A protein has these predicted regions:
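Conserved short alpha-helical segments that host acidic/polar catalytic motifs at enzyme active sites
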Residues: 1-311
Length: 311
């Protein structure tokens, strides 16, 4: 694949099991902090790569705020971290975020063994121009989660460009202040089958204190996935269907919604949200139903899910 080829060209042999962190930063000392937390969590940095870009694709505001874009290749360093690789990836990223919370230019768009995020303050027609990697014939993907709009309720920033790590979001989360408060209140009582009690404390806070409503929803969805919650259950726990007004709903599905409603408050829009865990990809509209989402299956068996037919 392209990622392993880019390492091989530099004389680095990357094993089958590896992850790539995509990092925005203006201070390369941040990479040292990232490496330190990798080592704490039994992960090993094997290759650091500056992502090649073509700045002619950028407008002036994007160019003025352009971070350095770095890819860090990470592998498990012990048998235990190999068995808990995805958990250690998540824990490492959260600890880096906590440590560098005051560094407004530091952001990790993705750190995963399954997904990599190429995003920025770029017009959609220019993304392949800006990211030279995307033009390589060996760069293959099984799906793409793509978002054309920039943040509308917050100042456009590289780190706030969508998609986020697990979602792309059209609309607003109007319940976000209540959602954030409820997550903070309940987080101290949470138990996990994936993380130890001490690791859970190191993960907190679940939601980054800076960021948009989409950032908070992304943080919460990602937290559920990292703790072993099924992709579909996690999605519908946060963004439930209007089950109270669906008298013919399957009784088991209704029971699921009744149960989750006692434990978790809905993240209400109006919103249309696309989600992925690296294996599945899906799209939901919230129970208000005020943001469109349409799908088209083409003659060559491609599935497109968009907010508008003309997208």
């Amino acid at each position: 694949c392209f990622m392993r080829k880019s390492a091989t060209e530099k004389g680095i042999d990357v094993p089958e099991t590896y992850a790539v962190a995509m990092i925005f930063t203006k201070d390369l000392k941040d990479i040292d902090v990232f490496t330190e937390y990798c080592e704490i969590n039994d992960l090993k940095v094997v290759f650091v790569r500056t992502v090649p870009v073509d700045i002619s694709a950028l407008g002036q505001q994007a160019l003025d705020n352009l971070p350095q874009i770095i890819q860090v290749f990470v592998v498990p360093n012990t048998l235990m971290s190999s068995k808990r690789f995805d958990a250690m990836i998540y824990l490492t990223r959260k600890e880096c975020e906590h440590k560098l919370i005051n560094d407004k230019d530091f952001y990790i768009p993705s750190f995963s063994s399954k997904v990599i995020s190429y995003k920025g303050l770029i017009m959609p027609t220019h993304i392949k121009t800006f990211y030279v990697d995307l033009r390589d014939e060996d760069f293959k993907i099984s799906f793409s989660l793509f978002h054309q709009r920039f943040s509308t309720n917050t100042l456009p920033l590289w780190r706030l460009a969508q998609p986020f790590r697990a979602i792309a979001h059209n609309g607003e989360i109007n319940s976000v202040e209540a959602n954030r408060f409820n997550v903070e209140v309940k987080s101290e009582q949470l138990k996990s089958e994936i993380f130890s009690e001490s690791e859970m404390k190191r993960l907190l806070p679940i939601l980054q204190p800076i960021g948009s409503d989409s950032t908070s929803l992304d943080n919460m969805f990602e937290f559920l996935l990292a703790n072993g919650v099924d992709f579909f259950k996690a999605a519908r726990s946060l963004i439930p269907a209007p089950w109270q007004n669906a008298p013919h709903m399957d009784s088991n599905l209704r029971a699921f919604y009744e149960y989750t409603a006692t434990a978790m408050e809905a993240w209400d829009g109006p919103a249309a949200v696309s989600l992925t865990d690296g294996r599945h990809i899906g799209c939901l509209i919230d129970r208000n139903g005020l943001r469109p989402s349409k799908y088209v299956i083409t003659k060559d068996d491609k599935l497109y899910i968009t907010s508008e037919y003309g997208t």
